[in-house]
Amino acid sequence: MNGILISLEGPDGAGKTTVLQEILPEIQKMKREVVPTREPGGVRVAEEIRQIILDPKNTEIDSKTELMLFEAARRLHMQEKMLPALRAGKVVIVDRFIDSSVAYQGYGRDLGVEVVDWLNYFATDGLKPDLTLYFDIDTDVALERIMKNRADEVNRLDLERAEMHRKVREGYLEIVAKEPERFVKIDASQSLEKVVADTLEVLKKRFVSEF
């Protein structure tokens, strides 16, 4: 494969989805075609799995079921959308990927990093991003943002207790520390304009020949 895979990661409330929307007009100026996508989702069946995972009514979904639903959606998404684009030499930029499962299910749900790493490898055949942008934010600030900005569309994972969200952030920070060559940490507590500017600066420096 000669494409480029970029993932965006961060706790709920960090604003990475908004940042992706803001940077798209600029990164679509890259020499290669850019394919924006998201997890869970990206293709039809994976989007249906997304609705099951995030529906606040589905309280009977336990931690292991949740993890396996995420991995099933990931496999579908990778096979149908990500791999064909990467094989065609395109730039795939994905809102959440393998590290979300490690942070949320491995750390947040206490299922164990080794278990999640293995399932990620099984679902993706070992595919890893060329670059992962991690949007970091204090847990209390993130939860305030969720309640303020998404009060009318809070999902099942948003409703988790604050302690779970703290474990997710701590997990992310450990993941970032383990692979410093793959990750770039961005301060998501700044203004949206500054976060967008920092994100574009990182991308243009890392992939200078692509712009």
Swiss-Prot record:
GO biological process: dTDP biosynthetic process; dTTP biosynthetic process; dUDP biosynthetic process
Molecular functions (GO terms): ATP binding; dTMP kinase activity
Enzyme Commission (EC) number: 2.7.4.9
Reaction equation(s) it catalyzes: dTMP + ATP = dTDP + ADP
GO cellular component, one term: cytosol
Binding site for ATP: G10, P11, D12, G13, A14, G15, K16, T17
Keyword Nucleotide-binding: yes
Keyword Kinase carried by entry: yes
SUPFAM superfamilies: P-loop containing nucleoside triphosphate hydrolases
Disulfide bonds: none
Protein family according to the UniProt entry: Belongs to the thymidylate kinase family.
PANTHER family (alphabetical): THYMIDYLATE KINASE, UMP-CMP KINASE 2, MITOCHONDRIAL
Name the UniProt record assigns to this protein: Thymidylate kinase
Gene (UniProt): tmk
